[in-house]
């Protein structure tokens, strides 16, 4: 049996591998715990999270993403809305939100919802772009039309600088224990160029009003990947060189990343 398309794409990914490393590197213990994943997209993160143990429920906004995730991991995949988390108060031991909150127009009420379904003392993990204006990577995004004010990536905002993320979580009942960043300039720059190339190709055959939640910047189904089959073969052939380009980030370890992860626990007295 051929490998699922999500895993095929992951094998040739750049930023996704860094995201997965950051996610699994900061994931709290999950064995024997009930865990909620928000922002499962097409199920790639769900696949790896479930390998870590625990019982996972995974959610996303997009119907097509939910359908793809179900094909990959089969069960406990739920389509949600943008205003509430449809579970009982204190239902989960762990809540993980993966590059998800920046898409929510009214983010603070949604944070309260995420905290509500977490048990007191439960573990919380948030991943998001940092969205720091004035940096070279941000200037590249603006040039390519990927900033939030240009409706890039379907974002309601460009992201959360670590201090802003910490403040948002703490005023809603999460005691933040730490933050970290990942994905430095060379990886971010190349990922944006690849997203732009895919976006241009996708939009030539699709009405812009039919764009999906992620703004059509990467394949979000097996059918979408098949439609760019020749281009993907070229990309695969160039992948070793592209991967080598991203390794330049190791030469500038003092340069902070463009993505962030924050983790903490729900206060015992939080609602």
Across the structure, where does each feature detected by a protein language model lie?
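Short N-terminal helix/helix-N-cap motif within the alpha/beta-hydrolase-1
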Residues: 105-109, 136
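A short glycine-rich, Lys/Arg-flanked "PGG" loop and its adjoining helix->strand segment in the class I
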Residues: 108-123
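Conserved class I S-adenosyl-L-methionine
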Residues: 125-147
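A SAM-dependent methyltransferase catalytic signature shared across enzymes that methylate proteins
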Residues: 163-180, 229, 237
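A C-terminal cap/extension of S-adenosyl-L-methionine-dependent methyltransferases
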Residues: 139-145, 181-271
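Residues lining the SAM
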Residues: 98-101, 127
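Conserved N-terminal segment of class I S-adenosyl-L-methionine
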Residues: 1-88, 94-98, 238-244, 254-261, ...
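Acceptor-substrate binding/catalytic loop of class I
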Residues: 147-164, 182-184
């Amino acid at each position: 049996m051929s490998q699922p398309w999500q895993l095929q794409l992951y094998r040739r990914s750049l930023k996704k591998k860094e995201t997965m490393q950051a996610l699994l590197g900061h994931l709290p213990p999950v064995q024997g715990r009930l865990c909620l994943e928000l922002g499962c997209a097409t199920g790639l993160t769900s696949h790896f999270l479930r390998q870590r143990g625990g019982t996972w429920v995974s959610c996303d906004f997009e119907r097509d993403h939910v359908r793809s995730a179900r094909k990959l991991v089969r069960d406990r995949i739920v389509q949600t809305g943008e205003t509430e988390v449809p579970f009982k108060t204190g239902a989960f031991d762990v809540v993980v939100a993966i590059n998800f909150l920046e898409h929510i127009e009214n983010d603070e009420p949604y944070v309260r919802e995420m905290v509500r379904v977490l048990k007191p003392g439960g573990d919380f993990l948030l991943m998001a772009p940092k969205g720091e204006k004035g940096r070279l990577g941000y200037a590249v995004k603006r040039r390519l039309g990927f900033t939030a004010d240009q409706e890039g990536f379907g974002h309601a905002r460009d992201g959360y600088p670590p201090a802003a993320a910490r403040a948002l979580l703490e005023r809603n009942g999460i005691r933040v224990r730490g933050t970290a960043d990942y994905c430095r300039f060379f990886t971010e720059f190349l990922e944006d160029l690849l997203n732009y190339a895919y976006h241009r190709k996708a939009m030539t055959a699709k009405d812009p009003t039919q764009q999906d939640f992620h703004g059509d910047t990467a394949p979000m189904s097996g059918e979408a990947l098949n439609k760019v089959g020749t281009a993907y073969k070229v990309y695969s052939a160039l992948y070793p060189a592209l991967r080598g380009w991203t390794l330049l980030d190791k030469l500038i370890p003092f340069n902070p990343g463009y993505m962030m992860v924050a983790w903490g626990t729900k206060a015992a007295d939080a609602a």
